[in-house]
Regions:
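Non-heme di-metal
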Residues: 1-258
């Protein structure tokens, strides 16, 4: 895996980030505003508002496997903190109160802590894909330019986070991921999107969104990820088996891949 390429991406991506015009007038029917306020406040907590780092019991051992590993993980989570900052501005814009905990938030962190860093990173990948659906639906239906602009910024980042996970997994599985992994990937996606709908469905409906939109975004996102991962794995396998020296070995044994 090309660590330096991803480190450079995260550093460069800090630039050219036009801030939404938070001072623009805000107007929304009260019922819709109230539901949106709760939804965005909960998302602000989950999207970098808690412990914005790997929290699995073996996370520090994983980060300590190399300076490049530590740096790329830290840069990735720095971008998540930026999302939390943007969402905090959105919370203030719509007159919401900040949320300090929810059942879903506590469950999310409990799972991440107990099941190991590789499972945690799988969960985070799935959440990135589910969140893409959340922000797309919000951007389409919110009817407020600064909030839509915030969604565009976050979606730009999320797309590259998903690519980052694809490269990481291709380095670990040059022959492709197995059926069990795909099963877990799909199952976690369905579980996460149901949690999303149960927690935010009233907001989506008030804005004009539907359950079908959210579920379609998840399933299309997962299908696209698996297709791109298979293509990348084929390329990685060719490099690994077709070269000698350190390049192929690095792709297979890279610490971030295991």
């Amino acid at each position: 895996m090309n660590y330096q390429s991803w480190i450079q991406h995260f550093r460069t991506n800090r630039l050219d980030r036009p801030e939404p015009d938070w001072s623009a007038p805000f107007s929304m029917p009260e019922k819709r505003r109230r539901l949106l306020a709760r939804s965005i406040a909960e998302y602000q907590l989950g999207d970098g508002g808690g412990e914005c780092c790997l929290v699995a019991q073996d996370a520090e051992a994983f980060r300590a496997t190399g300076e490049e590993v530590r740096e790329v993980v830290d840069l990735w989570f720095a971008e998540e903190r930026e999302h939390s900052r943007l969402l905090a501005r959105a919370v203030r814009r719509i007159g919401a109160e900040f949320v300090t905990t929810t059942f879903a938030f506590e469950l999310f962190y409990a799972i991440r802590r107990r099941l190991g860093v590789q499972f945690e990173m799988l969960v985070l990948l799935v959440v990135e894909i589910v969140s893409t659906g959340y922000y797309r639906v919000l951007r389409r239906h919110v009817g407020d330019q600064p909030l839509a602009d915030m969604c565009r910024l976050i979606l730009r980042d999320e797309a590259r986070h998903i690519d980052f996970h694809r490269d990481r997994l291709a380095a670990r599985h040059p022959a492709g991921v197995g059926i069990l992994w795909k099963w877990w990937f799909r199952l976690l996606g369905e579980a996460c999107v149901w949690f999303l709908w149960l927690g935010h469905g009233r907001c989506f409906r008030a804005l004009g969104g539907t359950r079908g939109e959210i579920f379609r975004h998840l399933r299309r996102g997962q299908a696209a990820f698996l297709a791109k991962l298979a293509k990348r794995c084929a390329t990685t396998q060719h490099v690994t088996t077709g070269t000698t020296g350190t390049t192929g070995a690095h792709l297979v044994s890279s610490p971030i891949a295991h």
